[in-house]
């Protein structure tokens, strides 16, 4: 029994000195495993006389249970300490203010496109689209633009070959629409266009929205009234608007439209005109029966004027300090 007391004391001491779960598990195997001293003592009962065997067995069980209880308590202590350490490491100061969630916003160019298309869709104009890689027929020929026109030159247009180019305007959408639809036609064509130019007010890629209206009674007076209403709604001001005679191969008569700026100067905002009879003939519409008007506007130009932006290139530099102003 002296040996039993010694084993029990050693087990209790080892358990008390265990610093983590791994060390405690090693002690469990050492003292309570199949080859441990408590197991050996129980196996040694066969050498004890039958009369003394019950009492000796009881003492061994009591000692083993004492050590087992100590081991269980130590295990709880270590697990609790480990949990507390983990909680302390991960604790959150609930008195701190929460972090603000950054939400995205629409790009100012997208906002302008949405604003323009919403206005005209309420007047019955539907959105049409077309390819950005266009043929010279749809980009130039069908629009009454002659072969010698400077817009066809390499310094203005990105050509793939003599017949394919990056479209310089969304007017090709008008031609494709008139080929497949019969008047009355009332469409708008927003999209990307490309020109070989880059400075403070020009970029190689920009956005354009064109309008086309074809009907038997389409006239310039109706066009002027439509654009007056649009510009005042877009800028949310009762602006002064003027129409200046101009020249576009695909419209006749043609005009450029200006608005009076806050600095007292006229600012050009878009071009327009009555669809040229040759353009109508090119798509099989009789110009003696139908007339039409077309409008072309640069989205970035409108956006710059609405939000007082001085450099068009800022729209494409992905500077969050700039873009956050429009959220």
From Swiss-Prot:
Example of a GO biological process term: phenylalanyl-tRNA aminoacylation
Organism superkingdom: Bacteria
Comment on bound cofactor: Binds 2 magnesium ions per tetramer.
InterPro entries assigned to the protein according to its UniProt record, in alphabetical order: aa-tRNA-synth_II (IPR006195), aa-tRNA-synth_II/BPL/LPL (IPR045864), Phe-tRNA-synth_IIc_asu (IPR004529), Phe-tRNA_ligase_II_N (IPR004188), Phe_tRNA_ligase_alpha1_bac (IPR022911), Phenylalanyl-tRNA_Synthase (IPR002319), tRNA-bd_arm (IPR010978)
Localization: Cytoplasm
NCBIfam families: pheS
A Pfam family matched in the record: Phe_tRNA-synt_N
Name of the protein described by the UniProt record: Phenylalanine--tRNA ligase alpha subunit
Requisite cofactors: Mg(2+)
GO cellular component: cytoplasm
Residue positions binding Mg(2+): 252
Organism the protein comes from: Pasteurella multocida (strain Pm70)
